[in-house]
Regions:
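Well-ordered alpha/beta subsegment
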Residues: 93, 98-137
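Cys/His-coordinated zinc-binding microdomains
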Residues: 30-33, 47
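Flexible extramembrane loops and terminal tails that flank transmembrane helices
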Residues: 1-24
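Cysteine-rich micro-motifs
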Residues: 41-48
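Glycine-rich active-site loops that engage anionic ligands at enzyme catalytic sites
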Residues: 64-103
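Short functional micro-motifs and their immediate structural scaffolds
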Residues: 37, 51-53
Length: 137
């Protein structure tokens, strides 16, 4: 499936730079000891901006929900229909979630609760790598 190419800004550039190195990083607040995603200028829990830093994660999680898209309005995704969209809870902080198309997983075989690990796919328009997830158990 074609991947949309993100255009990183100053706030999410560290995230996408790490993706290009095939590392998964998200923000962590050293003040309240919590992870957060997507990136924000300050901690979404305590409001502190001086204590927010980027930390590398294990790249493991679990599928907590999913849908199958049969009719997308996004023209670049139409050739890949139907496709999965899964919600992934990160092992380090299950309250923090990411979305994935689960490349290589048939639309009728997405097990809720299954373990997943991050992989990185290259977008065709810019060459930017983006995180995706694959089922491992």
């Amino acid at each position: 499936m074609a991947k949309q190419s993100p255009i990183p800004d100053a706030l999410d550039k560290p995230f996408y730079d790490a993706c290009n190195e095939e590392r998964l990083v998200i923000q962590y607040c050293a003040n309240c000891l919590r992870y957060q995603f997507p990136p924000r200028p300050e901690c979404t829990r305590c409001g502190n901006n001086a204590s927010v830093e980027w930390q590398q994660l294990s790249g493991r999680g679990r599928i907590i929900s999913r849908v199958v898209v049969h009719d997308t309005p996004t023209s670049s995704l139409i050739p890949g229909q139907p496709f999965n969209v899964a919600v992934i809870a990160l092992d380090e902080e299950p309250e923090v979630t990411m979305l994935s198309h689960l490349p290589g997983t048939p639309v009728d075989q997405v097990p809720i609760g299954a373990a997943v690990e991050v992989i990185f796919e290259t977008t065709s328009a810019t060459g930017q790598k983006v995180p995706e997830w694959r089922v491992v158990g």
